[in-house]
Swiss-Prot record:
It comes from Pongo pygmaeus (Bornean orangutan). The gene is FUT2. It is an enzyme of class 2 (transferase). GO terms for biological process: carbohydrate metabolic process; fucosylation; glycolipid metabolic process; protein glycosylation; regulation of cell adhesion; regulation of endothelial cell proliferation. This is Galactoside alpha-(1,2)-fucosyltransferase 2. Residues 1-14 are cytoplasmic.
Length: 343
């Protein structure tokens, strides 16, 4: 029997084409969904694109940050400690936006910023640090760690000194302004070859040290000894004094040698000018506080610091170790504690 095969009718052909098209689209969507899932991280672990270029694949696990508390010197210590400990533990480091706004206008820092909206989505593990390095800090557990405390000790980061100095390189305009000021100074009619930065911390410390910490701030006697130490070792040095108590300095620092200049503006809210002047000097005389410690660390050269400025039973010594704050090669001059003993 001859069977005649008739072609599909027009509506049937359209129906088959429709089914084929829908099936194809469905399978493509399924494949795309699988590919997208491979690239997406869970919601609580934000993707931070800025790390992909700076860090190798083996270092992209987790996020480490640190609290941004205190003024310039404190935040420099926090930055350097985060930089060193994150590297030591093989974790990527990010700084809070507040820290970036404090440091970035002055220094060429490189750590990426962790914005508050991103930080709020991360299940942080807070990890408190003492103000000195401990062996356990080499093995801090956790991928999402927020370091806390006021760390400012060379024991955390001195093995990375070159890198830390690079991080705290002044912007050109900040450095040039300081150098321009120093070039204009003279001692007895000639331009000096040795500049000694002097930082005198006063302000709140004048009351906080004796009342809270059983300690003292630098007095007239200490500063005279420190200046004479440099005068005995260098020919015609010039002393560039910065302070948040400049009126006291002008009354108590001996200027009879015509080698003392009162500089800077002492404005704690905008410390770049004072700090830059100190770091561009050859040597440093500091009193107390992290501002002076960092100025000396960046300047290099000889450093004189106020030593033993608390009573032996001071609660300050529970959170502060002098040997972890002052480099071994720095020279300490003991403070006069007699005002404390009178009370």
């Amino acid at each position: 029997m001859l069977v005649v095969q008739m072609p599909f009718s027009f509506p049937v052909a359209h129906f088959i084409l429709f089914v084929f098209t829908v099936s194809t689209i469905f399978h493509i969507q399924q494949r795309l969904a699988k590919i997208q899932a491979m690239w997406e991280l869970p919601e609580q672990i934000p993707v931070l694109a800025s790390t992909s270029k700076a860090l190798g694949p083996s270092q992209l696990r987790g996020i480490w940050t640190i609290n941004a508390i205190g003024r310039l010197g404190n935040q420099m210590g926090e930055y350097a400690t985060l930089y060193a400990l994150a590297k030591m533990n093989g974790r990527p480091a990010f700084i809070p936006a507040q820290m970036h706004s404090t440091l970035a206008p002055i220094f060429r820092i490189t750590l990426p910023v962790l914005h508050s909206t991103t930080a709020s989505r991360i299940p942080w593990q807070n990890y408190h640090l003492n103000d000195w390095m401990e062996e356990k800090y080499r093995h801090i557990p956790g991928e999402y760690v927020r370091l806390t405390g006021y760390p400012c000790s060379w024991t955390f980061y001195h093995h990375l000194r070159h890198e830390i100095l690079q991080e705290f390189t002044l912007h050109d305009h900040v450095r040039e302004e300081a150098q321009k000021f120093l070039r204009g100074l003279q001692v007895n009619g000639s331009q000096p070859s040795t500049f000694v930065g002097v930082h005198v911390r006063r302000g709140d410390y004048v009351h906080v040290m004796p009342k809270v910490w059983k300690g003292v701030v630098a007095d007239r006697r200490y500063l005279q000894q420190a200046l004479d130490w440099f005068r005995a070792r260098y020919s015609s040095p010039i002393f560039v004094v910065t302070s948040n108590g400049m009126a006291w300095c002008q009354e108590n620092i001996d200027t009879s040698h015509s080698d003392v200049v009162f500089a800077g503006d002492g404005i704690e809210g905008s410390p770049a000018k004072d700090f830059a002047l100190l770091t561009q000097c050859n040597h440093t005389i500091m009193t107390i506080g992290t501002f002076g410690i960092w100025a000396a660390y960046l300047a290099g050269g000889d450093t004189i610091y106020l030593a033993n400025y608390t009573l032996p039973d001071s609660p300050f010594l529970k959170i502060f170790k002098p040997e972890a704050a002052f480099l071994p090669e720095w020279t300490g001059i003991a403070a006069d504690l007699s005002p404390l003993l009178k009370h």
